[in-house]
Amino acid sequence: MFVQGLFLVATLLTAQLETTFTVEYNGKKYEFHITDQDLQKGPAWPANQQNPPLSARRAIDAARNELATLLPNGKDWRLYEVTLRPIDDHWVYLVQFLEPLKGDGGGQQLSSGFQVVVLMNGTAVMPRVSP
């Protein structure tokens, strides 16, 4: 219940070689499209390399900056989770935040989530926003 309104859909569109992560928040749809070209611009994470090319801390910073530009109160959101997701031979970070806590009148705290996608070159993916 604390993460209501978050819908994540990951779809691989093979004809276009594109992966899309979708978040719905506050009546809007945010589609994070990642093309094969986007992935190729950044470093791969070879199986023989212990750590990813981009640190989790740098991915979090990039995601925080992107969230602050996307949402009016984005700078106030709390970090919830950082996930590594493989896409073919490359990886991306999925950085999830929870909005600032708000009461529902009954003393219970409700919070929605929002996820930002970060490439291994440190670039946060800018979403397409639609109503």
List where the protein language model places each region.
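Sec-dependent signal peptide recognition
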Residues: 1-9
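Boundary at the C-terminal end of the N-terminal hydrophobic targeting segment
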Residues: 8, 14-15
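Compositionally biased P/S/T/G-rich terminal and signal peptide-adjacent segments
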Residues: 16-44
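Exposed beta-strand-loop-beta-strand "reactive/processing" segments of non-cytosolic proteins
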Residues: 18-21, 76-131
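Short, non-transmembrane alpha-helical segments in secretory-pathway proteins
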Residues: 45-82
